[in-house]
């Protein structure tokens, strides 16, 4: 109500960190409940932030949206297999730092599989900047709908979430220009991305 222009409010549906204790079938009611609460609250769209959840979890979250009548965006994370060089559906907090990684399947495969059930926007999220442009290219090659990107801004040290190797607004804008040139229509930021970096993205409208 206080905005000077029309805006849309997105409702974020999170994944689960310790789902293995319960099995995929136990998670569906949680997704259903999150979505119901957000829809009843009046959000304009739902964004499923599945991060690096196993493909079965991504599918379960997506199926929970089939009966709603507002737009749905789906976000997944991408990581690079250091042995093969392939982009994978998974997560790695930093390529340069020894942060560990989690891989499931080829990034191109999960995007292709998702596209068979989901025609709405698909985005790469919570990923190292160094893999984001490649992920956008694979999104473009495997999804006919809108694509986008909102990666992390740098590496964070546990347990304090102290961010290091932070990117400057100017450099973040330059990275985003690459995503847009490769087909991204939605751009933003995930962990470590603050107002200054988001503000820099506004310049994309003038280029």
Cite the ranges covered by each PLM segment.
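Domain-level signal for soluble alpha/beta catalytic cores
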Residues: 1-207
């Amino acid at each position: 109500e206080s905005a000077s222009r029309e805006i849309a409010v997105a409702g974020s549906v999170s994944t689960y960190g310790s789902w293995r204790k319960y099995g995929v079938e136990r998670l569906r009611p949680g997704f259903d409940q999150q979505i119901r609460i957000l829809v009843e609250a009046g959000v304009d769209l739902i964004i499923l932030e599945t991060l690096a959840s196993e493909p079965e979890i991504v599918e379960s979250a997506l199926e929970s949206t089939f009966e709603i009548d507002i737009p749905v965006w789906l976000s997944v994370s991408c990581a690079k297999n250091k042995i093969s060089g392939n982009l994978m559906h998974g997560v790695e907090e930093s390529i340069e730092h020894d942060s560990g990684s989690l891989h499931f399947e080829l990034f191109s495969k999960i995007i292709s599989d998702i596209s068979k059930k989901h025609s709405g926007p698909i985005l790469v999220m919570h990923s190292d900047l160094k893999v984001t442009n490649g992920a956008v290219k694979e999104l473009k090659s495997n999804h006919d709908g809108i694509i986008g990107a909102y990666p992390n801004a740098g590496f964070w040290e546990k347990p304090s979430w102290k961010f290091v190797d932070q990117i400057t607004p100017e450099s973040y804008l330059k990275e985003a220009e690459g995503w847009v040139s490769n087909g991204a229509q939605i751009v933003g930021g995930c962990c470590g991305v603050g107002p200054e970096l988001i503000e820099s993205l506004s310049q994309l409208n003038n280029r």
